[in-house]
Amino acid sequence: MALHVPKAPGFAQMLKEGAKHYSGLEEAVYRNIQACKELAQTTRTAYGPNGMNKMVINHLEKLFVTNDAATILRELEVQHPAAKMLVMASHMQEQEVGDGTNFVLVFAGVLLELAEDLLRMGLSVSEVIEGYEKACKKALEILPDLVCCSAKNLRDVDEVASLLHTSVMSKQYGNESFLSKLIAQACVSILPDSGHFNVDNIRVCKIVGAGVSASSVLHGMVFNKETEGDVTSVKDAKXAVYSCPFDGMITETKGTVLIKNAEELMNFSKGEENLMDLQVKAIADSGANVVVTGGKVADMALHYANKYNLMIVRLNSKWDLRRLCKTVGATALPRLTPPTLEEMGHCNSVYLSEVGDTQVVVFKHEKEDGAISTILIRGSTDNLMDDIERAVDDGVNTFKVLTRDKRLVPGGGATEIELAKQITSYGETCPGLDQYAIKKFAEAFEAIPRALAENSGVKANEVISKLYAVHQEGNKNVGFDIEAEAAAVKDMLEAGILDTYLGKYWGIKLATNAAVTVLRVDQIIMAKPAGGPKPPSGKKDWDEDQND
C-alpha cells in the first residue's frame, strides 16, 4: 500500500493538488505591482513621436515593427493575471477612443509604482485606493476647465487635417502633414448628415512600391485583384453581385451518361451550353454590365460573359463582397438569376488599373457622397505600410471621437502638468492620510511629459521644472517642445498640438480603475493548468518514425 502523505494544514489543504496560492502584501500586492511596472516600462519607451519601435515576432512567426501600444500588447500575449488587467484597460481605451492606449499603460504603471512607495511607508491599501479615487474624481472635474478650443467645422478638410495632426504624428513622425490631409479628405467625403460616422467605411489598400508620398484617396473601393474576362473598363457601371460561383448548376447525384453514337456525343454538351448562354444573356438583358462573384468563374460562363460584354470581377472574401454591396448599393444574390433594378448596384466607373506593378480593380464614385472611401497606401516594405495603416486607423478614430465631442485639450504634457499642479493643491486641503495618495496621483501625471522628454533625449527633470514654472504663471496651454534641441517649452494651442477631450477623459478613468483593481487584490489562487505537456516545437515530424 502506497504511503499517504497528509497535506499541511491551512489554506492549501482545501485545494486540489498542484494548485498555488499567494497572499499578503509581499507575495500578492508587490508581485502584481512589479509585473505591471515591467509591462508599462516596455511600452513607455514607445510613447510619443520620438518613441522607439518594438520588433515583435508572434506565435505564427509574423514580424511586427511598430510603436503602437495596442498592436504590441495584442501580439505579446501577456500571461500574468495582474498585467492582463492593464492590457484589458488599454483594449477598452482602444474600443472607446481608438487612440491613447499607451497613455493608459504608462499612467497606470506609474500609479502602481508610486502606490508601492506609499505601502512601504506604512499606509494601508484601502487608504491608497481611497486617495486615488478621490484624486481621479477631482481630475475629471478639472479637465473641462482645461479645454482650449473646439472643432468648428468637421466638413472643412484643412481644419480636420490640423486636428488629426497630433494623433498621426505619434505614429508617423515626419509624414504627419501629408497623411492627416489624406485621412481628412477620406473622412469628410463620407461624413453623413446625421453625423454618425462609421470607422469601417474608411478602407485601406496597401500596394508595395514608390514611397509614402505616392499614397492617395479614392471615393469608392479598391481591390487587389485582376478582372477575369476581356472587359477591363466600364463607365456608368451597373453591378450585379453574386455570392455563388459564376457557373452552371451541378446536380448532387452522379451524372453518368451512356452515349451510343457519335451524334449523341456531339449534342451532349449543347444543352448545357445553351442553358449557360441563356443565363448570361438574361443577366446582360437586365441592364447589368459588371458581374461580381464570390466563387469560381467557369470557362464556359466566362466565354459567354465576353460575348455579351460583361465585366467579371471575382472576390474571394465575403467581407469584401459585403463592403462592395454597401459601396454600390447592391444586394448579393445567392443564385445566378438576373437581378432586378433594386438589386443592382451603381457606380460611376469600374476599371482595371495598374499601381506600380500591381493590378487593382477600382469601383469609383465621382461624387463625394459615396458610402465608402479607400486610402491607397504606398511604401517600400510591408512592415512600413502596416505601420502607416495603424497611423491611418488612429487618425480615423480621432475623427470619430470629434464627431461625438468636439472639445480639445492641449497636448505635449501641458494638460498633465496643469492637472498635477491643481491636484497637488487639492491634496494640501485634505486632512486625512489619503492626502499622501492624492499627491502621489498628481505626481504620476508627470510621467507623461517625462516620457516625451526621455524619448526625445532631453533631461526630463529640466523640462518638468520649466513646465511647472510656466504653469504657475497661469499659462495652461504650455507643453514640451518636441522639436527643440534642448529642454524647451512652447504654447501647444499655437503649435496646433491638441489631444481630444474624450481621449484624455477615458484614459485617466481607465488607468485609475485598472491600478485600483490591481491594488485591491490581496490573494492569488491558481488552479493547476489542465492538459498534458505541449508537443516539442521545431520538429514538424516529431511523431513520425525517426528511423526511416
Curated annotation (Swiss-Prot):
GO terms for molecular function: ATP binding; ATP hydrolysis activity; ATP-dependent protein folding chaperone; unfolded protein binding. Its EC number is 3.6.1.-. Keywords: Acetylation, ATP-binding, Cell projection, Chaperone, Cytoplasm, Cytoskeleton, Hydrolase, Magnesium, Metal-binding, Nucleotide-binding, Phosphoprotein. One of its GO terms (biological process) is protein folding. Residues 529-548 are annotated as: Disordered. The modification N-acetylalanine is found at A2. GO terms for cellular component: cell projection; centrosome; chaperonin-containing T-complex. It is found in: Cytoplasm; Cytoplasm, Cytoskeleton, Microtubule organizing center, Centrosome; Cytoplasm, Cytoskeleton, Cilium basal body. The modification Phosphotyrosine is found at Y505. It catalyses: ATP + H2O = ADP + phosphate + H(+). Mg(2+) binds at D99. ATP binds at G100, T101, N102, S170, K171, G412, D499, K504. SUPFAM superfamilies: GroEL apical domain-like (SSF52029), GroEL equatorial domain-like (SSF48592), GroEL-intermediate domain like (SSF54849). The keyword Transport does not apply. Gene3D superfamilies: GroEL, GroEL-like equatorial domain, TCP-1-like chaperonin intermediate domain. It is an enzyme of class 3 (hydrolase). Component of the chaperonin-containing T-complex (TRiC), a molecular chaperone complex that assists the folding of actin, tubulin and other proteins upon ATP hydrolysis. Component of the chaperonin-containing T-complex (TRiC), a hexadecamer composed of two identical back-to-back stacked rings enclosing a protein folding chamber. Each ring is made up of eight different subunits: TCP1/CCT1, CCT2, CCT3, CCT4, CCT5, CCT6A/CCT6, CCT7, CCT8. Belongs to the TCP-1 chaperonin family. This is T-complex protein 1 subunit theta. It comes from Gallus gallus (Chicken).
